[in-house]
Amino acid sequence: SDGKDEIVVGTRADQLHAINDNGTNVPGFPVAFGGDVNGSPAIGDVDNNGDLEIVVNIGNGTVVALHHTGATMWTRFIPNANFFAPSPALGNVTGDAKLETFIPSSNGSLYGLSDTGADLPGFPVVYSTTTYTESSPVIADIDADGLLDIVLGSEEKYIWAWNRNGVVLAGFPLSTGDAMRGVPTITDLDQDGS
């Protein structure tokens, strides 16, 4: 609450750092985990209490949400899954003013987690039976129905899109003809309002 931004970054040395503008550690950091911190941390007010939380994926198949103090909010282990490059995405998909977490895993499934780390209804969803993705999900209202959707690129040459209930949107998956490792960008490029 000093009006200055901090830098939050994970390392291959199993730690999450939060660093002040003068190079010192934020109190409570670094936080140590039992695996590499992969991808970028996602930051938002997950529980709608006015404070920011941090959500990270750990290379051992764990998703962790932390309070801004570094204390653990919740931990969720995903069986048979190791996380690689993808970063979690946060969004108020259910409309309850709290943020849900979406993260793809190496077992070919996209997980949707509530503000407490529990599975959302309709999740996980399968995006691949043969491979994983290095892409991160994006949350946007791509069908212009006023509700947020989840979009993910895959190594199997498809772009997937699901609604908040885990139902694949009409017209998806879309074939791109090649694997995707980057994160999709969502915009109204033709400015037609959808």
Where are these regions (language model features)?
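Extracytoplasmic/lumenal domain signature
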Residues: 1-194
